[in-house]
């Protein structure tokens, strides 16, 4: 770190769906940050959970914004806009901000010591595109960060940037050193990623299990996600032979069920 004083952090995240992931994330951060994280600014994208969110650990602000219609028209959500507005309108008194997905959380008290002045998770498989599951940077640079950059291009161009993919480039242009964090696979390579030397876990698409995104209903199996949630609470991030058997059976049942639904109801059938 360029300063002699120990950095302090405010977490920024957005919530959608049920409270499982956001509650677990904040509980883990509070337990494993050694007091370095002093608050959390949460965007309620469910727009109905403000009271419940205010009762969670570390929460200092719950923000609710009008939907960004242009972004929602692209993929059914306005996550980039929500994070941008949180940085612009939230109250920050700490030296640093940590943006985290609600289904990302530390698993070791060493995670804070692994953070540099600017530390940004990379999208798995990329050497430049950054991911909002974990982004730490000085609060004074929040005006530089734009999670929405080029996001609307996804409506016309396959492979256009998703949420926060340009943040690494934006912060590099400030001239400050930027540490890009590579992932290692979790759950035997089938689900989730570790960052910061295995001290931080990101599940990925966790909120879709309880959310209302029709286009993502077939992206994750709700039955399989129940197993992963159970293992997360047990602090176990690998699968047993019995787990593999159960996941395979659920996968086959889901494929057969969705094919039958498609045959009976046609293109209007939503995958489950």
Sequence positions of predicted segments:
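A conserved hydrophobic helix/loop-capping motif in glycosyltransferases and polysaccharide synthases
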Residues: 9-18, 32
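Active-site-proximal specificity loops/subdomain of glycosyltransferases
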Residues: 48-93
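Short beta-strand-to-loop acidic/aromatic patch adjacent to the donor-nucleotide binding site
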Residues: 94-105
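Short, acidic, metal-binding catalytic loop of nucleotide-sugar glycosyltransferases
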Residues: 27-37
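Conserved catalytic core of nucleotide-sugar-dependent glycosyltransferases
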Residues: 105-173
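Short, charged/polar "capping" segments at the starts of alpha-helices
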Residues: 18-22, 46-53
């Amino acid at each position: 770190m360029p300063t002699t004083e120990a950095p302090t952090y405010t977490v920024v995240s957005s919530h959608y769906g049920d409270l499982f992931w956001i509650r677990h994330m904040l509980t883990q951060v509070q337990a494993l940050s050694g007091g370095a994280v002093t608050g959390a600014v949460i965007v309620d994208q469910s727009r109905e959970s403000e009271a419940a969110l205010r009762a969670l650990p570390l929460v200092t602000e719950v923000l609710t914004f009008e939907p960004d219609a242009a972004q929602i028209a692209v993929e059914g959500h306005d996550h980039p806009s929500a994070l941008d507005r949180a940085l612009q309108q939230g109250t920050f008194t700490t030296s640093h901000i940590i943006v985290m997905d609600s289904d990302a959380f530390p698993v070791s008290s060493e995670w804070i010591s692994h953070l540099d002045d600017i530390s940004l998770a990379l999208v798995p498989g990329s050497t430049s595109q950054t991911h909002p599951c974990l982004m730490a940077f000085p609060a004074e640079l929040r005006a530089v960060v734009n999670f929405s950059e080029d996001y609307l291009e996804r409506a016309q161009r396959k492979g256009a940037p998703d949420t926060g993919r340009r943040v690494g480039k934006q912060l590099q242009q400030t001239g400050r050193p930027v540490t890009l964090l590579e992932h290692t696979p979790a759950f035997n390579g089938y689900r989730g990623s570790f960052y910061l030397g295995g001290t931080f876990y990101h599940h990925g698409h966790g909120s879709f299990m309880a959310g209302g995104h029709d286009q993502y209903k077939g992206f994750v199996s709700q039955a399989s996600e129940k197993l992963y949630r159970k293992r997360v609470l047990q602090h176990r991030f690998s699968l047993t032979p019995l787990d593999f058997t159960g996941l395979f059976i659920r996968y086959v049942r889901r494929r057969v069920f969705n094919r039958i639904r498609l045959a009976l109801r046609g293109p209007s059938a939503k995958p489950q």
